[in-house]
């Protein structure tokens, strides 16, 4: 027995390699948990993830604190002192938890017992010779764990007494020992204090070098902060009696003032604002002493009818040099007041028209912007109302017949004339008018049948507008309206009115005549009629508004049996062939120039024969190009019955044009010269239209008139 144990001792002192089991283990793999010799470790850790395994040297005699192991053995002895059978079981359970460590201890104990020669004590037996009860060891471990967690004071004190004397035992490996410690809790808080000596010597040098302001300047700025440090250095020099180097070190340790000076708040003085808002009451006129500095105005809150009132004082003294500009600005501010003034003025001229029509036609339509007041004319509004209302279809025929016996003059919107009159007046007069009529206009707007916005958005009848062509998209200026809508009457016997705008059922627009001819002849005839046969303003406007229709023609009919048919047929044919040319600003200027030089037109045309021949050749080429190959291809050809009525109608027109020519010769010698030469732009189309029977020939004739009236012909 002793020999066998003596032979096993040298083998158990050093571990054997786990792979070859022949060589002693030198390395321990931390990932694998196995002991290797150098050769076996190199063979096993060459591929894959094994290359990254870490190793440590095997320490056969490592010293560990074994106070917890001793406490565990003492606990087992105190638990089961009489029961000898349970003690080895509990010891074996502890050896299961710490197998190799306890095996070493038990082997040493067994070796000493065998050397003594007496194995009477069962505790001295080798642990592997004792029976092992797994359930009992598990139960004892649970009980020990619960008692340890409960924290018995007495047992802890005894363990602490034994723990004060640590016992070192030799183990083969660190990994084989599983230690459980009971650390003390730190009751004292950690205090970190920064003193004068906390800065190192290099840090103090850095502070001296990179200081923002020199230290002498800081002493002058903050003298109180340096009194105490100087006294402290003086006491240190007296007590310690050190040399100069030590005194320099003490000066370095003086508390320095803060590196960053406190930032002072900048008080920026702002000047008082030049603009002041003062809320004025009813007595603001007496309190306001200096009217030349500001222009006060009072704005009242808008009620349900969106009323805005503004009052202005001392306008001329404030703005002596900019009356026109501020006149516009003031009326921009009082837009509602000026709008009501315009409406009141327009309503005087439109009262009779509203009664005659018998429907609710408003005097003036409100516009969203102020600039649209001048652009909207009474003729256009009445024209659109007639187009919208289907009940006025009969009135159009009556208007054609009425103009056979009554003359009509071109009408200008009263709102346009009102604005022109206001522009010619002084600033004082305009301001007085706006201030005087302010209250009355607001009262008139209250008594209106419909509110401001309902007139714009809500209509009593459905809107079914006819196609208006490019007329809808181009703005017509007030100077150009005179050229677009001319009408004339001579001596009250006959009248000839040009067709203003016509549209066919297939919505094809064809030009009627040139703008220059329109302007020259219409203005000359209008002036002649106004001199010979003047009419009242109300009668002119009534007849003009009743007769002006975009799809009808104002033609006098001699035969009373053919009044309705001839008028409608003429409007139908002209709707397919003739349309008013939309004027532009350049065209209006040309018409004005031709109107001024209408007396010299015949002389210029008669003197230049070469230009006349060139124009004739152009007419021939134009006729060839305009003539279609097949008459069936003409999209505007009329049936035979309509053509016959059309021819009869134009025979009547030719007879009427001859009478007009004779009367113009008697009244105006210049007009006679131009008509004798055959180039009167107003009468020549009427003379020659009777010779044509188709729309195609009529278009050719109109193109010929365009060529004759070219603008560069006057320059020649």
From Swiss-Prot:
It comes from Mus musculus. It comes from the Eukaryota. This is Zinc finger B-box domain-containing protein 1. Residues 78-123, 381-400, 420-447, 526-562, 657-698 are annotated as: Disordered. One of its GO terms (molecular function) is zinc ion binding. Residues 92-109, 420-446, 527-560 have a biased composition (Polar residues). Pfam families: ANCHR-like_BBOX. SUPFAM superfamilies: B-box zinc-binding domain.
């Amino acid at each position: 027995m002793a020999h066998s144990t003596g032979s096993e001792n040298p083998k158990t002192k050093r571990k054997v390699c786990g792979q070859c089991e022949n060589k002693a283990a030198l390395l321990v793999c931390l990932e694998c948990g196995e002991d290797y010799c150098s050769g076996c470790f190199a063979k096993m850790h060459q591929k894959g993830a094994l290359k990254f395994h870490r190793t440590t040297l095997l320490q056969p005699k490592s010293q560990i604190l074994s106070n917890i192991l001793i406490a565990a053995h003492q606990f087992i002895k105190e638990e089961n002192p009489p029961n000898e059978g349970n003690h080895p079981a509990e010891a074996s359970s502890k050896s299961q938890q710490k197998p190799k460590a306890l095996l070493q201890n038990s082997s040493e104990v067994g070796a000493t017992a065998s050397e003594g020669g007496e194995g009477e004590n069962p505790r001295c037996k080798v642990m592997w010779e004792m029976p092992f009860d797994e359930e009992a060891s598990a139960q004892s471990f649970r009980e020990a764990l619960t008692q340890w967690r409960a924290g018995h004071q007495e047992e802890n004190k005894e363990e602490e007494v034994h723990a004060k004397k640590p016992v070192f035992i030799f183990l083969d490996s660190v990994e084989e020992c599983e230690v459980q410690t009971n650390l003390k809790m730190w009751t004292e808080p950690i205090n970190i204090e920064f003193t004068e000596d906390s800065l190192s010597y290099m840090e103090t040098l850095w502070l001296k070098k990179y200081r923002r302001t020199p230290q002498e300047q800081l002493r002058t700025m903050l003298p109180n902060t340096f009194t105490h440090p100087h006294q402290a250095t003086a006491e240190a020099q007296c007590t310690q009696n050190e040399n100069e180097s030590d005194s320099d070190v003490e000066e370095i340790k003086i508390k320095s003032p803060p590196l960053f000076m406190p930032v002072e708040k900048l008080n920026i003085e702002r000047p008082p604002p030049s603009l002041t808002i003062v809320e004025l009451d009813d007595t603001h006129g007496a309190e306001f002493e200096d009217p030349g500095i500001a222009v006060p105005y009072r704005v009242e809150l808008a009620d349900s009818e969106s009323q805005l009132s503004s009052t202005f004082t001392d306008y001329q003294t404030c703005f002596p040099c900019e009356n026109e500009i501020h006149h516009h600005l003031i009326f921009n501010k009082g837009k509602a007041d000026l709008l009501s003034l315009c409406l009141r003025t327009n309503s005087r001229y439109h009262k009779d028209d509203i009664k005659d029509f018998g429907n609710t036609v408003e005097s003036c339509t409100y516009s969203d912007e102020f600039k649209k007041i001048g652009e909207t004319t009474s003729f256009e509004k009445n024209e659109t109302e007639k187009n919208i209302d289907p009940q006025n279809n009969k009135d159009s025929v009556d208007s054609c017949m009425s103009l056979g016996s009554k003359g009509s003059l071109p009408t200008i919107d009263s709102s346009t004339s009102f604005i022109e009159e206001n522009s010619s007046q002084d600033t004082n007069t305009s301001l007085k008018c706006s201030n005087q009529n302010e209250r009355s206009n607001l009262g008139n707007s209250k008594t209106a049948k419909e509110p401001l916005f309902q007139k714009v958005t809500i209509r009593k009848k459905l809107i079914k507008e006819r196609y208006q062509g490019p007329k809808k998209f181009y703005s017509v200026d007030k100077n150009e309206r005179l050229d677009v809508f001319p009408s004339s009457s001579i001596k009250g016997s006959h009248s000839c009115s040009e067709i203003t705008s016509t549209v066919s059922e297939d919505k094809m627009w064809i030009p009627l005549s040139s703008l220059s001819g329109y302007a020259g002849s219409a203005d000359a005839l209008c002036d002649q009629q106004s001199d010979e046969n003047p009419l009242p303003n109300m009668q002119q406007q009534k007849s003009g508004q009743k007769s002006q229709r975009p799809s009808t023609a104002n033609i006098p009919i001699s035969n009373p049996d053919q009044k309705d048919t001839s008028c409608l047929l003429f409007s139908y044919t002209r709707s397919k062939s003739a349309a008013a040319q939309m004027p532009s600003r350049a065209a209006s200027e040309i018409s004005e120039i031709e109107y001024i030089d209408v007396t010299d037109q015949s002389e210029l045309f008669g003197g230049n024969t070469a230009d006349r021949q060139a124009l004739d050749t152009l007419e021939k080429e134009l006729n060839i190009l305009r003539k279609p190959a097949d008459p069936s291809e003409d999209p505007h050809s009329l049936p035979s019955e309509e053509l016959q009525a059309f021819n009869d109608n134009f025979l009547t027109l030719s007879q009427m044009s001859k009478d007009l020519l004779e009367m113009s010769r008697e009244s105006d010698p210049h007009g006679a010269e131009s008509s004798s030469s055959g180039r009167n732009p107003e009468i020549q189309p009427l003379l020659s239209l009777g010779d044509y029977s188709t729309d195609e020939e009529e278009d050719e004739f109109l193109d010929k008139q365009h060529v004759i009236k070219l603008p560069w012909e006057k320059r020649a």
